[in-house]
């Protein structure tokens, strides 16, 4: 097995974790009430990722681009890594909520020349119906519901491509609030160097727990939480952004319950906690386990 210091791609990182600590919880998803909705270990995640990679290879998607349209949850991170193992370039973006959002997604599909959309089976028909109405929507786009089992046409596993560190791992898109969404290419090497720096600074390790409600298509959510947790071999507890927006205290309750050492958010999130959490509720919280709470992605207000 390759040594940790010799890892040069994100897929190698997951393989390492699955071999070294297969029974360690990798990710846990909480529902709106703060109860566990689902969880996955590194070993189970690796198995599911390989299945998705085979599905993508069987669809002929190697070396092609794919849009990832997922709600918050473990299904996203499994699909994301399925792309990496299959040599498919993933572009995670937000679920469309309006005609304006549909137009942005159409622009991203055009800009990336995407060949496929990865999504949940329950969302496929709705997305087909709404997105296909967009001008210049590609008629040959492949829809891949990654949570649905499909019998492979070939019983033999297709060989996984060899990925090198200089290859582009994924695309991150700007919000497109003031102009067309712009894609940023993130290489495996660039991402791993960033993760190494963050983990070294935070001193996170395989005993660490992260808590995040941040969108998985944003850098702070994807890299600083989902991938940093994987890099350190820790456990990442997830909440939906909508859960935090309606009940900010659930973020702090998760930190309290799981004795999390690491979390982060933009300044507005901390201010929302200050404004919305009542003194009586504060008595139920214990944030003494925190080693690092990142405040980033927007201007910091010292008064917060």
Predicted segments — roles?
Residues 2-9, 103, 144-168:
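Flexible, low-complexity linker/hinge segments
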Residues 14-40, 168-171, 178:
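AMP-dependent adenylate-forming
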Residues 22-25, 153-173, 179-180, 190, ...:
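Conserved pre-ATP/AMP-binding loop-to-beta segment of ANL
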Residues 27-64, 68-77, 81, 98-106, ...:
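Conserved AMP-binding/adenylate-forming core of the ANL superfamily
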Residues 73-96, 107, 112-116, 208-209, ...:
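A short helix-loop-beta submotif of the ANL/AMP-binding
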Residues 85-153, 267, 272:
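Structural core segment of the AMP-binding/adenylate-forming
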Residues 131-145, 241-304:
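Conserved adenylate-forming
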